[in-house]
From Swiss-Prot:
This is 3-methyl-2-oxobutanoate hydroxymethyltransferase. SUPFAM superfamilies: Phosphoenolpyruvate/pyruvate domain. Homodecamer; pentamer of dimers. Catalyzes the reversible reaction in which hydroxymethyl group from 5,10-methylenetetrahydrofolate is transferred onto alpha-ketoisovalerate to form ketopantoate. The gene is panB. It comes from Campylobacter concisus (strain 13826). Mg(2+) binds at D50, D89, E120. GO terms for molecular function: 3-methyl-2-oxobutanoate hydroxymethyltransferase activity; magnesium ion binding. Binds 1 Mg(2+) ion per subunit. GO terms for biological process: pantothenate biosynthetic process. The keyword Cytoplasm applies. Transmembrane segments: none annotated.
């Protein structure tokens, strides 16, 4: 398999916007400097997602992630990644009004090297996104299935199944583009609806569980690399059996310690 390292300088907001209809955007999550440094060679965008609450901290949802958590992990990712465009998630409850949203979004720009923030938003928040953009904050609007709303909606439900819902999603995407959002993250949406949204808006649409006819894809790294053995959504392709590889390595280490094989002379200092 060809090594698809991306030879690049630090990507800017214009680099990402210019990929619309030209080159698929590769986005992947990261939550620490170690993995961010690895992903930096391959990802156009690294998303410091509130998904870390589930995939990194093993919580049942994203809801308890807070600003201090997101700032900590965004700082770590920015330490490891020097070329990718860094997108930070605004956690649940951190943008309930314009004043709060601006204050918290500014923290990502003042305290980390993040390039943009992502918000799970609906039509009632178009003006909020507009105000953030007016303050010089790059915003990606997350529409479709919104994990922060799972309790309100009674679960994680695929979007675009009805004609009315599909129409509303197109209208939302257009409204957030008009408000100044540099891109749309579209989650859990029927592929034909995702295709129509991508066709109508002039900004990049990055999909997750929304089919192939979008401007880019994002996956949670631990899903994509096979670290969750009992959890595999339909839209996730596993490119590695990570859990098995790690388990095999730790098992070998434990066995060698128990049997006094490690450390051998090769790994010991001699006087």
């Amino acid at each position: 398999m060809k090594d698809e390292k991306i030879a690049k300088k630090k990507l800017t907001i214009n680099d990402i916007k210019n990929k619309k209809g030209a080159e698929p955007i590769v986005m992947i999550t990261a939550y620490d400097a170690l993995f961010a440094k690895i992903f930096d060679d391959y990802a156009d965008v690294i998303l410091v997602g509130d998904s870390l609450n589930m995939s990194f901290n093993m919580k049942e949802s994203t809801l308890s992630a807070d600003m201090s958590t997101m700032l900590y992990h965004t700082k770590a990712v920015c330490t490891g990644a020097k070329k990718s465009f860094i997108l930070a998630d605004m956690p649940f409850g951190s943008y309930t009004n314009e004043k709060q949203a601006i204050k918290n979004a500014m923290k990502f720009f003042k305290q980390t090297n993040a390039d943009a923030v992502k918000l799970e938003v609906g039509m009632h928040q178009v003006n909020l996104v507009k105000r953030l953009c007016e303050e010089g904050i790059n915003v990606m609007a997350h529409i479709g299935l919104k994990p922060q709303f799972f309790k309100f909606e009674g679960g994680y439900k695929i979007k675009g199944k009805s004609e009315l819902e599909a129409k509303r999603l197109v209208e939302e995407a257009l409204a957030f583009e008009q408000a100044g959002a540099f891109g749309i993250l579209l989650e859990g949406t029927l592929s034909n609806v995702a295709s129509e949204i991508t066709r109508q808006v002039r900004v990049p649409v990055v999909g997750i569980g929304s089919g192939a006819d979008v401007d880019g894809q994002v996956l949670v790294w631990s899903d994509m690399l096979g670290f969750f053995e009992d959890f595999k959504p339909k839209f996730v392709k596993r490119y590695l059996d990570g859990a098995a590889l790690v388990r095999k390595g730790v098992q070998s280490y434990a066995s060698e310690v128990k049997n006094k094989i490690f450390p051998s002379e090769e790994f010991s200092y001699k006087g």
